[in-house]
From Swiss-Prot:
Annotated catalysed reactions: (S)-4-hydroxy-2-oxopentanoate = acetaldehyde + pyruvate
Pfam families noted in UniProt: DmpG_comm (PF07836), HMGL-like (PF00682)
One Gene Ontology MF term: 2-isopropylmalate synthase activity
Protein name: 4-hydroxy-2-oxovalerate aldolase
EC code(s) of this entry: 4.1.3.39
Positions contributing to substrate binding: 13-14, 167, 194, 285
Length: 340
């Protein structure tokens, strides 16, 4: 089968953020089965923050992720199940455990300027026989030249593909294009792109990335992902078909999956709320939204103020504990102002 673009469906990983990591085995089986039947080549399954992400810091999973991964693997006849691993959260032991369950892909994620911490994890994933991707998160925080330098490191460690990851949904189309061009000029492995829709630019950025040569593309069915979600897979498939770009994925089956199976899972409609918009505007990690909203309720303040301050401080993924600290500081300032 010819695929001009390789689609990885991320709803069962990135979408975990949107539902507070409450996926059940039954939901994963139903979604993964439908994705496999639609001929999606890669399906990512894990806690939203990757292997071993279930914690007070990032959010506790309702169901142990290994059970979810095993369930997905058991129903996939052609698709490879993938996992995300952030060094420092997940370990090589976690990677080996996932591989033993039958996963076929590992994506090793670091901050955009910290590719060096991925070396042993990429090497181990390759040793385990997994399709291995480097995942450069918060890509808006690194200039194209810096991002290219980091991508070359991941390639040198053995990555089969390197992704530009717009974790905050902050990139504008020209910025997305610049970054893809920079990687295409210096890599011999394929370039991937992962978008978030916080500024309503996920589709535009993804199409620009494809036009600049990215061939591994992430989508999330029904837009189920952190913040305002990702590039909506079924919509992307329709657009690419109109453009004459082959994905090998069945559009009608993906539409049915979105409408009949994934839509009922959503706790609220996936839309660009004011907080999701501020994520993209301020350049804040998309999974911070629900954490900031909880902190705002606790301290009686505006969640947008928290997110704007986090953006000003350039807080990155893994610093979720800063959200409560910032909220407390803002609440103290509010209180001091009222006293005066």
């Amino acid at each position: 089968m010819t695929r001009d673009i390789v689609i990885t469906e991320v709803a069962l990983r990135d979408g975990s953020h949107a539902i507070n990591h409450q996926f059940t085995v039954e939901q994963v089986v139903e979604v993964a089965s439908a994705l496999d039947e639609a001929n999606v080549p890669y399906i990512e399954v894990s806690h939203g923050d990757g292997l071993a992400g279930s914690s007070l810091q990032y959010g506790l999973s309702r169901t142990p992720e290994l059970e979810l991964i095993e369930a997905a693997v058991s129903v996939c006849k052609q698709a490879k199940v993938g996992v995300l691993l952030l060094p420092g959260i997940g370990t090589i032991k976690d990677l080996k455990t996932a591989a033993a369950l039958g996963v076929g892909m590992a994506r090793i994620a670091t901050h955009a300027t910290e590719a060096d911490v991925s070396a042993q994890h990429i090497y181990q994933a390759k040793e385990l026989g997994l399709t291995t991707a480097g995942f450069l998160m918060m890509a808006h925080m690194a200039a194209p030249e810096k991002l290219a330098e980091q991508a070359r490191l991941m390639q040198s460690y053995g990555a089969d593909v390197v992704y530009i990851v717009d974790s905050a949904g902050a990139l504008l189309p020209d910025q997305a294009g610049e970054r893809v061009r920079a990687l295409k000029q210096c890599l011999h492995v394929p370039v991937g792109f992962h978008a978030h829709n916080n500024l309503s630019l996920a589709m535009a950025n993804t199409l620009v990335a494809i036009q600049e040569g990215a061939t591994w593309i992430d989508g999330s069915v029904r837009c189920l992902g952190a913040g305002a979600g990702n590039t909506q897979t079924e919509v992307l498939l329709a657009v690419l078909d109109r453009m004459g770009i082959q994905t090998g994925v069945d559009l009608y089956k993906m539409m049915d999956l979105a409408e009949d199976i994934v839509s009922p899972i959503l706790q609220v409609p996936q839309e660009i709320t004011r907080d999701a918009l501020v994520l993209g505007y301020a350049g804040v990690y998309s999974s911070f939204r629900l954490h900031a909203e909880r902190a705002a309720r606790k301290f009686g303040i505006d969640s947008r103020d928290i997110l704007i301050e986090l953006g000003r401080r350039k807080v990155v993924g893994g610093q979720e504990d800063m959200i409560v600290d910032v909220a407390a500081e803002i609440a103290q300032r509010y209180s001091s102002t009222k006293i005066r």
